[in-house]
């Protein structure tokens, strides 16, 4: 009865937006969400309008709270590769679509649903890992940070303090979920001089590993 009532309410919601699933919203979902939200994926499918429409209000809440797509890293600390985070414009469009009645639009504009397969993880070039915290004995090119044993709901800050006192924020994870476990590869690897102290601010027993780029593969 609840689902029938919800669907009936949706059917009577006024349409007050020109944003549609077939033109704008499906493209955002396919690019940012569907890698998990597809048939057989890690979460319920959102690849069709009929699948996404009942979740419209939940989608609005999740994107406004920046809980979806799951990423973990606080925005603005550092640029990372493969960051699925929504842009401000994408958030605005998703919210506007939901608040405007979540219309479907003309099927002629609908893009092809992407295909997904269980691909092997992409391996970035790295010479090895350094367990943190640590004081560097020689200069290194930092390529990535991987959190270890960070509990659900906890936060972690990894910061490099260089010998001259300058500070580089490597990653800040907030309200972490172990299901999000990943390596945060820097878009631009960072040269850290000898004597740099890399600190980890996180609850025990959490730690982190710094991946170091191989010479000649800094980018």
Regions found by a protein language model. Give the residues of each.
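Bacterial N-terminal signal peptides
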Residues: 1-6
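Conserved SET/PR-domain catalytic core that frames the SAM/AdoMet-binding pocket
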Residues: 32, 194-195
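His-enriched metal-coordination microenvironments in redox/metal-binding proteins
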Residues: 122-192, 199-219
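Aromatic- and Gly/Pro-enriched helix-to-coil junctions and flexible linker segments
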Residues: 9-133, 200-218
